[in-house]
């Protein structure tokens, strides 16, 4: 579970240290909480919601601290030896493109395509209507495809 929480935080904030801090803060908060976790219908959705909210808060804080400048650097969590350099660069490029999506689209796309949550789980985590989640993911994928096709050297073609 902690790994999933880290992945969501990392995908949203883009910095491994920030993601670790967020997950640690959430774990401490839950530990100190007076209410037992078994009172929640879906503990995983509850924890993901906490991570999501804390990650979005961290993004806002970082943006304000930098004077509104958007962060585009992506920390790669995988080694990049010479033979995988192109793959790593491509991966970083896709992450930058995902980060350029509107917040609501980026968030649900990450939860669906990178973390693997169902539409229903995403609706519970975000508090969105199920149909809105489905439409949002469709639009996010379409926007991402359009962004990637502008570069054209990453092999994504639109029909």
Describe the residue ranges of each PLM region.
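DNA-recognition helix of helix-turn-helix
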Residues: 126-151
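Amphipathic, Lys/Arg- and hydrophobic-enriched alpha-helical face
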Residues: 1-16, 33, 98, 150
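Residues within helix-turn-helix
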Residues: 17, 120, 131
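The N-cap/first-turn positions of alpha helices
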Residues: 2, 104-105
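Acidic, proline/glycine-rich intrinsically disordered inter-domain spacer in sigma factors
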Residues: 73-99
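A short pre-motif secondary-structure segment
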Residues: 108-112
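Arg/Lys-rich amphipathic alpha helix in sigma70-family domain 2
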Residues: 35-38, 49-69, 87
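Structural recognition of an alpha-helix C-terminal capping motif at a helix-to-coil junction
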Residues: 7, 21-28, 32, 41-53
């Amino acid at each position: 579970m902690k790994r999933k929480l880290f992945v969501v935080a990392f995908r949203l904030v883009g910095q491994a240290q920030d993601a670790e801090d967020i997950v640690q803060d959430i774990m401490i908060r839950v530990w100190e909480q007076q209410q037992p976790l078994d009172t929640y219908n879906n503990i995983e959705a509850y924890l993901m919601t906490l991570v999501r909210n804390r990650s979005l808060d961290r993004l806002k804080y970082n943006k304000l601290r930098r004077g509104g400048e958007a962060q585009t650097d992506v920390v790669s969590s995988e080694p990049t030896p010479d033979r995988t350099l192109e793959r790593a660069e491509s991966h970083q490029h896709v992450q930058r493109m995902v980060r350029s999506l509107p917040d609501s689209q980026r968030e649900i796309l990450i939860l669906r395509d990178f973390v693997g949550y169902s539409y229903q789980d995403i609706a519970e985590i975000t508090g969105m209507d199920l149909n809105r989640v489905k439409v949002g993911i469709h639009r996010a994928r379409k926007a991402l495809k359009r962004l990637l096709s502008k570069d054209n050297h990453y092999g994504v073609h639109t029909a």
